[in-house]
Amino acid sequence: MDVFQEGLAMVVQDPLLCDLPIQVTLEEVNSQIALEYGQAMTVRVCKMDGEVMPVVVVQSATVLDLKKAIQRYVQLKQEREGGIQHISWSYVWRTYHLTSAGEKLTEDRKKLRDYGIRNRDEVSFIKKLRQK
């Protein structure tokens, strides 16, 4: 494992990959390379506290792919910084909608492109209203 980390440290010194964190994962390196080749896009996810999470997904990603990418991003961030150990994602998705330009992303199988989401577009969380 040490050999892998040493090799990864050398790869991260490349100018295209220099903005990746020190404890980079292979998935993050692959995502950055896909971004450089135009095979992926960055979706800026705005939390209610104002924090913006740059999440990388493939160009043909669905809403479900975006949700899974958000989960991976938050999990990696928590591992690096500490903090809350467990988040109930089923509760998060049951309580909040993702929205883009005022439109709720309700269908998990629908492509982000069909909602008009492109590279560097913003998506935010909005609380679901209870239905009676």
Swiss-Prot record:
Lineage top rank: taxon: Eukaryota
GO biological process, one term: RNA splicing
Subcellular localization, as worded in the UniProt entry: Nucleus
GO cellular component annotations of the record: cytosol; intercellular bridge; nucleoplasm; nucleus; U12-type spliceosomal complex
UniProt cross-references to InterPro entries, sorted A to Z: SNRNP25, SNRNP25_ubiquitin, Ubiquitin-like_dom, Ubiquitin-like_domsf
Keyword entries, A-Z: mRNA processing, mRNA splicing, Nucleus, Spliceosome
Boundaries of every Ubiquitin-like domain copy: 41-132
Assembly information from the UniProt record: Component of the U11/U12 snRNPs that are part of the U12-type spliceosome.
Protein name: U11/U12 small nuclear ribonucleoprotein 25 kDa protein
Source taxonomy: Eukaryota, Metazoa, Chordata, Craniata, Vertebrata
Gene expressing this chain: SNRNP25
